[in-house]
Amino acid sequence: MSFFNAYYSEDFEDKLFVEEIIKRWNQGDNEFYIYTSGTTGKPKQITLTRKLLKWSATSTHNKLNLTRHKIMCCLPVQKTGGFMQLIRALIWECDIQFFKPSNDPLDSIGEHDFTTISLTPTQFKSSLLKFPEQLNKFRHILIGGAPSSNSSSFNSKLNHPQIWLTYGMTETASHIAMQNLTNNESVLNPLLG
């Protein structure tokens, strides 16, 4: 049994899916099924094992050197990016709040105490233009889904969070390599574990 709290925005549409995954995780299920995004062809169902999910979440936790954390999930929870945020919250035993995915995820949250967020490059660019003060409140921002621009474009606006470019796919249960753009790392580094 994991000790964490899940919260939902009023317009979040996948609460039943989240509750089913939480139930299955707490029952000890060993296999979970999600669909690929379809960016390289027709979406297909992928089986992710509990062992792989634990490795992915634990490797990310170790890479980010996390202590106290609270996740803001604004990605589709039935796809890898959002699904893994749920799995991380279960394994890390931290609070998570789910929001309806949009290109402007920070548009309606106001003041917040979230520490970690995963964004697509489109969401990140929009948030950087419109809500840099809210982005600055995060400790870690993970950007996945496509290549991102170099760090010079945001280093002048963001001085607090560590910004990570990630590389992964559904079949690997999220990212397998990360690059710290805040520290000007020049390459993606594989997660250890």
Per-segment meaning from a language model:
Residues 1-24, 141-142:
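ANL superfamily adenylate-forming
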Residues 17-35, 69:
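Conserved pre-ATP/AMP-binding loop-to-beta segment of ANL
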Residues 30-46, 168-171:
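Conserved adenylation A10 loop of the ANL superfamily
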Residues 36-39, 71, 86, 117, ...:
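Conserved S/T- and glycine-rich ATP-binding loop of Class I adenylate-forming
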Residues 47-58, 70-126:
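AMP-binding/adenylate-forming
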Residues 61-66, 131-133:
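Glycine-rich helix-loop-beta junction characteristic of Rossmann-like nucleotide cofactor-binding loops
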Residues 129-184:
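Gly/Ser/Thr-rich phosphate-binding loop
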Residues 186-193:
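Short Gly/Pro-enriched turn/cap motifs at secondary-structure boundaries
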